[in-house]
Every structure is written in structure tokens, then in C-alpha cells.
């Protein structure tokens, strides 16, 4: 009986060529696993393509709701952003995909898991670290670190020689990753930072200059940091993300073009469309400013940098990540309320923020008199607050 290899399968270029390559080089039975995290693919066609490419079996795992509730909710609570711009769409999906690969490997009695990640990318680290955390005895096959195919063009040639249909051409050669949270575009002419990216590549965001000529308003109700309602309507988790993606996207919200520092040491350029995430982050951040006390708010900003880096690096199945998420759940206890945003041609403006848990008090914050705050109290506070600075200055003067 042949050994079984579980393959992380998307139907894209990298995994399209992996099935025949595995059969040619390892003489194994390939079990393809496509994890549906919201990519806009026809899953029946994905199944057909896997079988036509030589897979013995194909699993399609629909995990969109789990992706939202167990991963993206955490992203929103943290406003998790890598290096100030990247909303971690790929990074949050990888541990869930790895989890499903391990589950299928156990079900099939497979000793090997194969992925189509390139030897220069972050995903190879994310997948293999996650798999090792769940089953340290599963062996990894990583074709990009083994074969002599050294470019997208060569990969296409190999696929065509094996009769495998590929979704890209040598002219249109972007590598794309699509899920419910984002779509990324890398490779091709984007590899030269001098090249302006082409807006024709957009899949879910309307170019701002082509967006609606009238502003749109959207209100989001959060409960303990989690979005629950859009314009007063309660929606299921997946439907809510789809709704905000649509509204933000048609108003030109959510595209970033960035150069990032990869985990493996090099810099890379990508264009990311994250319409709904960009909108939800802005609304959530505004509500936090109203409802979270100063010390917790400031400490969360510091930890958010670490959390985002941890997720980017693929360290999801770790004690640190679990502990940080426990912390943010406590911080978010009072982050309940409604934020209304005005959207217009790629711009967002806060229209209103309301919460029963608001720590802002107009009576205290106004310039008028207040029973809780006497202007005269400020003098004593300033004297104490500035005391270290005064002492330091006095000591300097004594030495002159």
C-alpha cells in the first residue's frame, strides 16, 4: 500500500503543479485538502481539478464561521496590524488551515503533509510551526525547497507539460491569496517598487475615483469588542463580514500598497485589499477610545504590536498568544456601543460614537464648573507631577 500525503490544496499555481510532482517523485497517494476560508472559488471546480490533476481524494472543509469567530474576532479586538499597515489577512488564516490539515492526516492515517509555499515566503514557517505544535511526528514535504523549478514561468511550463490547467499566464502572473478578510496581490511587476500598482487588479474594492459620488453612512454595533449589528440589523458572523466588505469596497475603502519585513529576513511588496477589516478597525478603535480607561488602553497599544508580530510569525498555537487573548477579552468587557461612519471615495470619517459604558463625561470635560473637578486642584497636581523635573533642574543649577 502506498504512503499517503495530505496536500494543502487551493487550485492555484503552486498547488496545481504539486500533485503530479509528488506522484512523479514519491510514488504516493495524494489526499488534497481545500480549506474554504471565504475565497471566491467554485469548490466543485476545485474538486474536479484536484482529481484531474491526479489526487486520490479531495476534502473541502468549509470553516468560514470558525475563521470569523475564533480568529477574526481576535483580530478586531486587537486592531491587529503588522508594521502599521498590514491587517494580517493571510496570517490569521494559516493556523486554521494547518489545523484542518492535521485533522485530515489523522483521519487518513497519513504520515506526511505537503504544502506549496515558496522557500522565500512566510507561509512555510507558519504552516510548519502550526503543524509541529499539533503533531510533532508528522513529516513535511515542501516542494519549493526541493525541486529545480525556480520561477513562476518555469512552474507554468511544468504544469502545462503535465496537462494541468493553471489560473495565471506569464503575462498576468500575480500570486493572490483570497479569504473572507482580504485578498493579497504579490509578484509580477509589483516586485519593482518603482512600478505603480494597477488598479485593474482589484477584486473587491472599487478604485476611489470610480466610487459612488454620494457619501454612504454605516453604523456598527459592537458588544464586548465584537461587531454584531450593521445599521441596526443583527447578522450572523460570516454575513456581517460579507456585508462590511461590500459596503466598504464599493466606497473605495481598504487598499494598502506596502513593503513589509518578512519573517524569513527579506523585504517584500504586496497590495492588499481589506475593505471590511479596514472599516471595522476604524469603528472599533473609536469605540475603544470612548470606553477603555487610560492605563488599559495604553498598555493594549504596546501589546498589540507584539500580538500582531506573533500572529504574523505563525505562533498561533502558543501559550503567549492564548495569554494575550485572555488579556484583550478583559480589556474589551466595556467595549459595547455603536459607531457611525461616513464613507466617501476611499475616505472614512467618524460621524458619531455612543455607548452606555462611555468614560467620557461632558460635565467633567467641559470648560465650565463641575462638582467633580475644581480648576484649583490642577495646581497641586502639577506641583507633584513636575517635582522630579524640578529636582533634576535644581541639582544641575547647584553644580554650576
From Swiss-Prot:
Pathway: Amino-acid biosynthesis; L-arginine biosynthesis; L-arginine from L-ornithine and carbamoyl phosphate: step 2/3
Binding site for L-aspartate: 118, 122-123
EC number(s) on file: 6.3.4.5
GO CC, alphabetical: cytoplasm
Location of the protein in the cell: Cytoplasm
Binding site for L-citrulline: 86, 91, 122, 126, 175, 184, 260, 272
MF terms (GO), sorted A to Z: argininosuccinate synthase activity; ATP binding
Key words, A-Z: Amino-acid biosynthesis, Arginine biosynthesis, ATP-binding, Cytoplasm, Ligase, Nucleotide-binding
Record-linked InterPro entries: Arginosuc_syn_C, Arginosuc_syn_N, Arginosuc_synth, Arginosuc_synth_CS, Arginosuc_synth_type_1_subfam, AS_cat/multimer_dom_body, Rossmann-like_a/b/a_fold
Pfam families on file: Arginosuc_syn_C, Arginosuc_synth
Catalytic activity: L-citrulline + L-aspartate + ATP = 2-(N(omega)-L-arginino)succinate + AMP + diphosphate + H(+)
Keyword Repressor carried by entry: no
Gene Ontology BP term (one): L-arginine biosynthetic process
Binding site for ATP: 8-16, 116
HAMAP family, alphabetized: Arg_succ_synth_type1 (MF_00005)
Oligomeric and partner information: Homotetramer.
Family membership noted in the UniProt record: Belongs to the argininosuccinate synthase family. Type 1 subfamily.
The protein's name in its UniProt record: Argininosuccinate synthase
Organism name: Clostridium acetobutylicum (strain ATCC 824 / DSM 792 / JCM 1419 / IAM 19013 / LMG 5710 / NBRC 13948 / NRRL B-527 / VKM B-1787 / 2291 / W)
Amino acid at each position: 500500500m502506498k504512503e499517503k500525503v495530505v496536500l494543502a490544496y487551493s487550485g492555484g499555481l503552486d498547488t496545481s503543479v504539486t500533485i503530479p510532482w509528488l506522484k512523479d517523485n514519491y510514488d504516493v497517494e495524494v489526499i488534497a485538502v481545500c480549506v474554504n476560508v471565504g475565497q471566491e472559488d467554485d469548490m466543485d471546480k476545485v474538486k474536479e481539478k484536484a482529481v484531474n490533476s491526479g489526487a486520490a481524494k479531495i476534502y473541502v472543509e468549509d470553516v468560514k464561521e470558525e475563521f470569523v469567530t475564533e480568529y477574526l474576532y481576535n483580530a478586531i479586538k486587537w486592531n491587529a496590524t503588522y508594521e502599521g499597515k498590514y491587517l494580517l489577512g493571510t496570517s490569521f488564516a494559516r493556523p486554521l488551515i494547518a489545523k484542518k490539515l492535521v485533522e485530515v492526516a489523522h483521519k487518513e492515517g497519513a504520515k506526511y503533509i505537503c504544502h506549496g509555499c515558496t522557500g522565500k515566503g512566510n507561509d512555510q514557517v507558519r504552516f510548519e510551526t502550526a503543524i509541529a505544535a499539533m503533531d510533532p511526528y508528522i513529516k513535511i514535504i515542501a516542494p519549493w525547497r526541493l525541486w529545480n523549478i525556480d520561477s513562476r514561468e518555469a512552474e507554468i511550463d511544468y504544469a502545462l507539460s503535465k496537462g494541468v490547467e493553471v489560473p495565471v499566464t506569464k503575462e498576468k502572473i500575480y500570486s493572490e491569496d483570497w479569504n473572507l478578510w482580504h485578498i493579497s496581490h504579490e509578484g509580477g511587476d509589483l516586485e519593482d517598487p518603482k512600478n505603480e500598482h494597477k488598479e485593474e487588479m482589484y477584486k473587491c474594492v472599487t478604485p476611489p475615483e470610480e466610487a459612488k459620488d454620494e457619501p454612504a453612512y454605516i453604523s456598527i454595533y459592537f458588544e464586548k469588542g465584537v461587531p454584531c449589528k450593521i445599521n441596526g440589523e443583527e447578522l450572523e458572523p460570516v454575513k456581517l463580514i460579507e456585508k462590511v466588505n461590500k459596503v466598504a469596497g464599493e466606497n473605495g475603502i481598504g487598499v494598502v500598497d506596502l513593503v513589509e519585513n518578512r519573517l524569513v529576513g527579506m523585504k517584500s511588496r504586496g497590495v492588499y485589499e481589506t475593505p471590511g477589516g479596514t472599516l471595522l478597525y476604524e469603528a472599533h478603535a473609536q469605540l475603544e477610545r470612548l470606553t477603555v480607561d487610560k492605563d488599559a488602553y495604553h498598555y493594549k497599544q504596546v501589546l498589540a504590536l507584539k500580538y500582531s508580530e506573533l500572529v504574523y510569525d505563525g505562533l498561533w498555537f502558543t501559550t503567549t498568544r492564548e495569554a494575550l487573548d485572555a488579556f484583550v477579552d478583559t480589556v474589551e468587557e466595556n467595549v459595547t456601543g455603536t459607531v457611525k461612519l461616513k464613507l466617501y471615495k476611499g475616505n472614512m470619517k467618524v460621524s458619531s460614537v455612543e455607548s452606555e459604558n462611555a468614560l467620557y463625561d461632558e460635565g467633567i470635560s467641559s470648560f465650565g464648573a463641575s462638582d467633580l473637578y475644581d480648576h484649583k486642584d490642577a495646581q497641586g497636581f502639577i506641583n507633584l507631577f513636575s517635582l522630579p523635573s524640578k529636582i533634576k533642574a535644581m541639582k544641575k543649577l547647584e553644580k554650576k
